[in-house]
């Protein structure tokens, strides 16, 4: 496909505008959503500096507490979830939030048997984001629980989800992964959803974790991948013990790992299970995380799966409907010592600015998290020590992770959600009833191939010790600063509003599809590359929009590539979202 160029003749307006304004540039319809400063006072660190993030969960009306159903039997699933998602379910231009919820694990158990009873009714929750202008301070977030109207009921013991428009009707649909039967929910477009699992042929009763919608065959519709974990039966719950001989949670090595699933979208509302013929089902693994991307530079979307305690999988897309596991050859199956690790969550980004995507994986305490630098041609190298990311991670068990440029300086940073999986004796001896809590972490990319931990200046929420699992990212208040949602096990949600990016320039692109590659050329000739994606992290869905931090620069050129098609915009305005039209010359679209 040819390349199409378009020049912007638009001047950025310094005034705050809420909503969208239609314009035309070379016949291409775009909308500009101008930046607005988030309302509210700035939280400060102990040194008096403005904290990088502020917890705004309560003031924004985002009240949710996870229930894991624990009754003292140490059932393995109860400490593994939850994830959740950030996506625009109603198409109004802002991000809504979806929460996965637990339940009692054994039939016949009652809520009064739970060690941590819950006051709210059980079930997944959907919160609608009603942004409102609060002049002159900017835009305020206000969330409304619309779960009942949405129709979600009996959604199982929740783990994670995937969000994507599988039928091309313009509305985002959901695939919910569970300990137990997974569910496919179609978005009707009127604020409600319907369970169409049987009709789509995507049911799976095994223990699934992370999932993703991805167009593996480049036919314009979204296919579906689900990572499966291990075989666990509550009726055959094995007993495991801590070093003190006290009861403790078992690890995945006590169980048989599963194979993953891949379904091809037929384009008629149904899916074909191609797990076996694609090659995906050839290898077992205790899958916890999955991320899609072109990891060998051949233009096709591949799948990388983080396995817990076993070699990871890098499924390279051959382009003929089959995949080959290239993890061992590529250097991403094991760590630098040749050992498998307890891989949980994962992130991909061009962390070193050399034009290709590197990989970062979270692991169990005492293993260290792992940074795989992309050497090109499908080869990777473990650079965890050299990036200074290994040592600070040793005390923690990490799950969700996000490559987020939290200060908009153009370098992708790392936010990490932590929480133990074995009883912490230091907490247990103090009488802690759920001694798995750990603080989360924030790392700033120095731009020289290394990172520095900046957790101490990240804000009060990063000083808390909780059992964090899922982590999702997105610009919730349209200020160009990407925010965080942290999903805690047996605890409250944390909405962490980004305050660190204020004053830095940025360029946002909305209307992107998962897999789109974005390139921005700055005025100093620096090239910034990003990939639109919703997957990665752990059991979570993030915003598909792309925000590119520019620091103090402006943009000379914006290029978007999709399935070999390419469009280029000259002199794009900054500090705005450019909303791509549904049909752009040069870019393939969904039917």
What is the predicted function of each stretch?
Residues 100-119, 228-255, 417-435:
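Short, conserved, GDST-rich strand-edge loop motifs in beta-rich repeat architectures
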Residues 122-130, 258-265, 316, 373, ...:
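Beta-propeller blade signature
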Residues 147-163, 177-216, 226-253, 257-259, ...:
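Asp-box/WD-like beta-propeller blade repeats and closely related beta-sheet repeat scaffolds
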Residues 81-91, 128-129, 158-168, 172, ...:
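Beta-propeller blade termini
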């Amino acid at each position: 496909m040819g390349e199409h160029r378009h020049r912007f003749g638009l001047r950025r307006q310094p005034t705050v505008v809420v909503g969208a304004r239609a314009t035309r540039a070379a016949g291409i319809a775009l909308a500009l959503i101008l930046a607005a400063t988030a309302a509210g006072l700035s939280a400060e660190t102990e040194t008096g500096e403005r904290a990088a993030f502020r917890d705004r969960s309560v003031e924004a009306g985002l009240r949710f507490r996870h229930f894991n159903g624990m009754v003292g039997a140490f059932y393995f699933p109860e400490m593994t979830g939850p994830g959740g998602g950030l996506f625009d379910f109603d198409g109004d231009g802002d991000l809504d939030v979806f929460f996965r919820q637990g339940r009692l694990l054994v039939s016949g158990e009652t809520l009064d048997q739970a060690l941590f009873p819950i006051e709210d009714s059980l079930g997944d929750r959907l919160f609608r984001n009603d942004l409102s202008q609060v002049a002159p301070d900017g835009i305020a977030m206000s969330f409304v629980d619309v779960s009942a109207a949405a129709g979600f009921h009996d959604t199982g013991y929740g783990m994670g989800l995937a969000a994507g428009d599988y039928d091309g009707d313009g509305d985002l649909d959901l695939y919910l992964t569970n300990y137990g039967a997974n569910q496919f929910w179609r978005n009707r477009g009127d604020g409600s959803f319907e369970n169409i699992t049987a009709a789509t042929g995507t049911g799976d009763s095994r223990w699934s974790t992370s999932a993703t919608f991805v167009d593996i065959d480049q036919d314009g519709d979204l296919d579906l991948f689900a990572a499966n974990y291990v075989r666990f039966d509550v009726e055959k719950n094995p007993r495991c013990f801590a070093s003190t001989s006290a009861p403790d949670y078992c690890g995945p090595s006590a169980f048989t790992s599963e194979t993953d699933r891949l379904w091809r979208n037929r384009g008629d509302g149904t899916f074909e299970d191609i797990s076996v013929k694609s090659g995906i089902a050839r290898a077992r693994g205790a899958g916890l995380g999955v991320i899609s991307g072109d990891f060998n530079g051949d233009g096709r979307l591949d799948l990388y799966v983080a396995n817990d305690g076993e070699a990871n999988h890098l499924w390279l897309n051959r382009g003929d409907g089959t995949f080959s596991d290239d993890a061992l050859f590529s250097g991403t199956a094991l760590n630098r010592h040749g050992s498998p690790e307890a891989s949980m969550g994962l992130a991909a980004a061009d962390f070193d600015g050399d034009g290709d995507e590197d990989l970062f994986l979270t692991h169990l305490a005492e293993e260290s998290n792992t940074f795989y630098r992309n050497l090109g041609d499908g080869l990777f190298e473990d650079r965890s020590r050299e990036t200074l990311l290994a040592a600070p991670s040793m005390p923690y068990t990490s799950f969700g992770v996000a490559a987020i440029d939290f200060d908009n300086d153009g370098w992708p940073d790392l936010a990490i959600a932590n929480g133990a999986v074995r009883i912490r004796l230091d907490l247990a001896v103090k009488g802690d009833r759920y001694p798995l809590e750990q603080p989360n972490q924030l790392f700033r990319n120095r731009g020289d191939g290394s990172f520095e931990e900046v957790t101490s200046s990240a804000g009060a929420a990063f000083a808390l010790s909780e059992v964090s699992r899922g982590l999702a990212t997105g610009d919730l208040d349209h200020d160009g600063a990407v925010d965080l949602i942290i999903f805690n096990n047996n605890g409250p949600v944390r909405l962490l509003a980004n305050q660190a990016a204020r004053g830095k320039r940025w360029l946002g692109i909305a209307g992107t599809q998962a897999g789109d590659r974005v390139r921005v050329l700055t005025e100093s000739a620096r090239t910034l590359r990003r990939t639109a994606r919703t997957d990665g992290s752990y059991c979570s869905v993030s915003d598909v929009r792309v925000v590119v931090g520019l620091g103090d620069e402006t943009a000379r050129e914006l290029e978007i590539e999709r399935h070999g098609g390419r469009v280029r915009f000259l002199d794009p305005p900054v500090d705005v979202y450019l909303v791509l039209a549904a049909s752009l010359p040069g870019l393939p679209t969904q039917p």
